Amino acid sequence: MVEVKKHKFPGVYTVIDDDGSERIATKNLVPGQRVYGERVIKWEGEEYRIWNPNRSKLGAAIMNGLKNFPIKPGKSVLYLGIASGTTASHVSDIVGWEGKIFGIEFSPRVLRELVPIVEERRNIVPILGDATKPEEYRALVPKVDVIFEDVAQPTQAKILIDNAEVYLKRGGYGMIAVKSRSIDVTKEPEQVFREVERELSEYFEVIERLNLEPYEKDHALFVVRKT
C-alpha cells in the first residue's frame, strides 16, 4: 500500500512505496495533467505527481537532503532557463494559484513545448528572453521572492547576480544549479564550485551548497540570500 506524507518543505510530499522506498512528490495543481510522463499517485482523493530527481536538479537537491528551500506556497519565482517545464511544473504545484512563476527561456523551440502546459497552469508566465540581458524583460517581470537559475553557461553566477540586482526583493533568495563543465572543463569540479561560491558571496549571503550526485554528475546547487 502506497502512503503519502507531508515533507518538511511546505508543498512537497513524501511517497512511501510498498517496498518502503521513499520518493518526493507534489500535489497536482491540474489533476489529470502529466507533464513529462511522471508517475501519478492517487491518495485520499488527491493526485500527487512523483518528482523524478534524475530529470530535475531541484528534485535531486531535495532528495540529497537540501536544508533551505525558499520556494513555498504563494511565493513569486523568476525561473531562468525554464526549458520545457519539467521542474517548473513541480514549482507550479508548490506555489499554487496564489503564487507565480516567470519563466525565461532563450530557445523559441523549447518554449513552444511549454505552451500546452501553461494553458492549464496559469501560474506560469512563459517569456522568450535572454537571461544574460535582464533588462530585456523588465516590462514583464515584477520584483520576486525567489530566483531559480538553471542555465548552463560560463557566466552562470553573474547571470544570477545581474537578475537579482533588478528583480529580487531584499531578503529574497536565489537558487542556482551549477554545472562545473559548463564553466571550465579543465578544472576539477570542486575548484569550480569554490570559485563560484566566492563570486556569489561578493553579492549574496551564501546559505547552502549541495552536491547533486548521483543524480547529476559535476553539479552543485547553491542557495543564497540577498541582504
From Swiss-Prot:
Top-level division of the source organism's lineage: Archaea
EC annotation from Swiss-Prot or TrEMBL: 2.1.1.-
A Pfam family of this chain: Fibrillarin
Keyword line: Methyltransferase, RNA-binding, rRNA processing, Transferase, tRNA processing
GO molecular function, one term: RNA binding
Stretch forming the signal peptide: none
HAMAP family: RNA_methyltransf_FlpA
Subunit-structure text: Interacts with nop5. Component of box C/D small ribonucleoprotein (sRNP) particles that contain rpl7ae, FlpA and nop5, plus a guide RNA.
Summary of the function given for this chain in its UniProt record: Involved in pre-rRNA and tRNA processing. Utilizes the methyl donor S-adenosyl-L-methionine to catalyze the site-specific 2'-hydroxyl methylation of ribose moieties in rRNA and tRNA. Site specificity is provided by a guide RNA that base pairs with the substrate. Methylation occurs at a characteristic distance from the sequence involved in base pairing with the guide RNA.
The protein, known as: Fibrillarin-like rRNA/tRNA 2'-O-methyltransferase
Organism of provenance: Pyrococcus horikoshii (strain ATCC 700860 / DSM 12428 / JCM 9974 / NBRC 100139 / OT-3)
Lineage summary: Archaea, Methanobacteriati, Methanobacteriota, Thermococci, Thermococcales
Gene assigned in the entry: flpA
